[in-house]
């Protein structure tokens, strides 16, 4: 309703949320030893930690949840009017409004979808690592942006796919996991991530010309 640019609104609410997290936790690490212990129900949602079940031990059930969510959102984005309207708003908001579509409604839905999956990712992180810190996730937004752009989503809006996003995020994850194994230190990792992001955005600009 404030008509803020989506990127600025996202960064602003991210900073507010981080600040609230620091205030509530008093900047201390919070542990969840009971809910996330081996075999506990909370952790079992995202990873099998005991023998004798449907899946083998250490099977990442969170991957199945990811696949289900991705499939559902792919259908929503490509096969429903909600998805088509969201893409249309990203492509040309004013033309979409003049077509009689409730732009604010579908913009809000896009934010709701984004917030829901960000929250789900946070829950998964806590379930797997058993702790939560106010600064957990700092820098993840750069990886997310880079992954999305690498996956073919245009920063100008209107172009993108769920499968492309998953592929882009997978590439970024492989790089982050692989860097330590080849001796790349953390500050170099951030530098390389920045280079990848700039290159991906540049390629997006070239594709739109």
Report each predicted region and the residues it spans:
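Transmembrane helix-bundle core of multi-pass membrane transporters
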Residues: 6-80, 106-109, 129-134
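Membrane-helix interface residues
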Residues: 2-4, 80, 101, 160, ...
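Transmembrane alpha-helical segments in multi-pass inner-membrane proteins
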Residues: 111-112, 117-118, 128-193
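Residue-level recognition of membrane-helix boundary sites in multi-pass small-molecule transporters
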Residues: 6-8, 82-85, 105, 163-164, ...
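Membrane-helix/interface signature in polytopic inner-membrane proteins
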Residues: 71-111
């Amino acid at each position: 309703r404030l008509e803020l640019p989506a990127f600025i609104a996202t960064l602003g609410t991210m900073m507010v949320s981080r600040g609230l997290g620091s205030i509530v936790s008093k900047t201390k690490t919070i542990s969840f030893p009971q809910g996330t212990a081996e075999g506990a129900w909370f952790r079992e949602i995202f990873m099998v930690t005991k023998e004798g079940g449907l899946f083998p031990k250490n099977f990442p059930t969170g991957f199945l949840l990811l696949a289900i969510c991705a499939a559902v959102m792919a259908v929503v984005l490509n096969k429903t009017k909600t998805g088509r309207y969201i893409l249309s708003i990203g492509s040309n908001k004013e033309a979409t409004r003049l077509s009689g579509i409730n732009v604010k409604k579908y913009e809000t839905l896009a934010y709701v979808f984004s917030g829901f999956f960000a929250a789900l990712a946070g829950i998964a992180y806590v379930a797997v690592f058993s702790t939560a810190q106010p600064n957990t996730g700092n820098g993840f937004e750069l990886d997310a942006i880079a992954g999305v752009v690498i996956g073919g989503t245009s920063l100008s809006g209107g172009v993108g796919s769920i499968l492309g996003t998953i592929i882009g995020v997978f590439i970024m994850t492989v790089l982050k996991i692989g860097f330590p194994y080849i001796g790349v230190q953390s500050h170099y990792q951030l530098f390389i991530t920045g280079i990848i992001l700039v290159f991906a955005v540049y390629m997006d600009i070239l594709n739109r010309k």
